[in-house]
Amino acid sequence: MSTSDYKDDPGLTGKVAIVAGGGAAGDGIGNGRGAALLLARSGTKVLIVDRDPKLAARTVELITAEGGTAAWHSADLTNEVQCRDTVTSALDRFGRLDFLDNNVGISSRASVVEEDPDTWHRVIQVNLDPIFFLSKYGIPAMIKTAGRGAIVNISSISAIRPRRLTAYTTAKGAIIALTRAMAVDHAPEGIRVNCVAPGPVYTPMVYAGGMTDNARDQRRRASPLGIEGTGWDIGGAVRFLLSDHARYITGQTLVVDGGVSIMSPNRESEEHDRPKA
């Protein structure tokens, strides 16, 4: 083995990606939009999929304004037929499929005692069904048109460090398990499957809820780095895991949280009680 054996090329140029949940309000950078923009900047052709066509179309506008190649497709990704049609749309437009980035998800703030059964089922459905259906039809398309492929599923640090989000935590934990199962099942076919677990990131979905400056400051202080994450941070992790730079990585969960998950839950009170010099 010599230095010439390694090619410093991420292998993204000319490839095709489906980014599920690639829309975002206005010009904000959500996890999916961040990944889509970064992939397009690396030469990947991107199909932006969102239930709201206006949000998907805006992501396409942002990509094409930078000289990238993208198209949008509106779909309810909890519906199997619409997921199948999404994969067909990517093949019809771009002729191949290499990557799948699954960002779709919703949350609910309740304990198991408080949770409404209908909400429980809906949270599980929206977080898991799009991954299942898009992978069901996407993996055969990758094998047929590209000979290999890569998938990134978006989980959450809530799956690692649970909070009062029982349905969401359960769904995101299941995504990690599903990722590992898919990685084992499809490795012989050249398909890598990994997971990104975001921590507190400031995205359009978050600030649409009216997060206060004080709440944002608390989030920053929860990180040992003292900073807040963005959709760009998650998008960068997705791009890495889809690239050839991650060719030897599969079945793994990359935690992108500024170190929040390695800290004691009582860090703030501990710091408050620490003697001052």
Features from the language model and the residues they span:
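Substrate-binding pocket helix/loop in short-chain dehydrogenase/reductase
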Residues: 111-112, 116-124, 219
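C-terminal helical subdomain
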Residues: 8, 195, 214-245, 249, ...
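Canonical Rossmann dinucleotide-binding motif of NAD(H)/NADP(H)-dependent dehydrogenases/reductases
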Residues: 10-47
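Catalytic loop of short-chain dehydrogenase/reductase
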Residues: 152-174, 179-188
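Short C-terminal tail/terminal secondary-structure segment
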Residues: 2-9, 239, 250-277
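Active-site loop of short-chain dehydrogenase/reductase
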Residues: 15, 68-72, 96-97, 142-155, ...
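Alpha-helical segment proximal to the catalytic Tyr-Lys
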Residues: 140, 184-188, 247
